């Protein structure tokens, strides 16, 4: 049995609410569009630093973007 917690997110919903493309958000925070896509689909969990950068860029609290 796998007891590892999987971090989930509302990144796509928040990003589209702010009318940003994956490319625009990626360029704003200095990562690739593929990184944004991978986070949105749950293929990649961001580091604490990247999660904080996303929160700042999108003007959201951590718990508004990420949950378990």
Annotated model-derived regions:
Residues 20-35:
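Short alpha-helical DNA-recognition segment
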Residues 1-17:
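A short, Lys/Arg-rich alpha-helix, primarily the initiator
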